[in-house]
Design a protein with these regions (language model features):
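HhH-family (HhH-GPD) DNA N-glycosylase catalytic core used in base-excision repair
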Residues: 1-171
Length: 171
């Protein structure tokens, strides 16, 4: 795995935010998530956590393990918006605005994902009148039916496992 430290990133918050529908926790490895975007597959997990103090705000400094090819890491860094300083955004909220302060802290692990516009529009259309689990099912069914099949080897414990997945269909 490729290890990278970040603050203001929580995999579960991102997966459950309704922002994307192809980020799911692996049933056989709690805390590890698979993410599919365009022609890319990633497995990612949080390994350790520490605390970082800035001004009056305390942030979790987390180390994440990216299970992908080195040449794909830059794609995922852009996807998760990792070049942006979310701590600075949260710290810029006025201290006397308790409502916004609370909102910033509650969602401090959510990042703005740089998703493929086509996939984002279609999943938005699919999302009307559905729950997040139903949207995920619909998106996966659409991808299996019309997307391109891929195979990727990922490290699971001490063994490599081949994963079969489908990219989201293109226009």
């Amino acid at each position: 795995p490729i290890l990278k430290p970040f603050t203001c990133m929580d995999l579960r918050q991102i997966a459950d935010s309704g922002q994307c529908f192809r980020m799911t926790e692996l049933s056989d490895m709690p805390g590890r998530f698979s993410v599919i975007s365009q022609e890319h597959y990633l497995e990612i997990e949080q390994l350790e956590c520490d605390w970082k103090q800035t001004d009056e705000t305390r942030f979790e400094a987390k180390t994440f393990a990216f299970y992908c090819k080195k040449e794909e890491l830059s794609f995922w860094e852009r996807y998760f918006d990792l070049d942006q300083d979310y701590e600075a955004y949260i710290n810029s909220v006025r201290k006397r605005d308790s409502y916004l302060q609370h909102a910033a802290q509650a969602g401090s692990g959510i990042r703005i994902l740089n998703q493929d516009p086509w996939e984002m529009i279609l999943t938005f259309v699919i999302s009307q009148q559905k729950t997040i689990p139903k949207i995920r099912e619909a998106v996966e069914a659409l991808s299996r039916r019309f997307g391109t099949e891929h195979r990727t080897a990922v490290l699971r414990g001490s063994q490599e496992k081949e994963i079969t997945w489908h990219s989201f269909p293109t226009p």
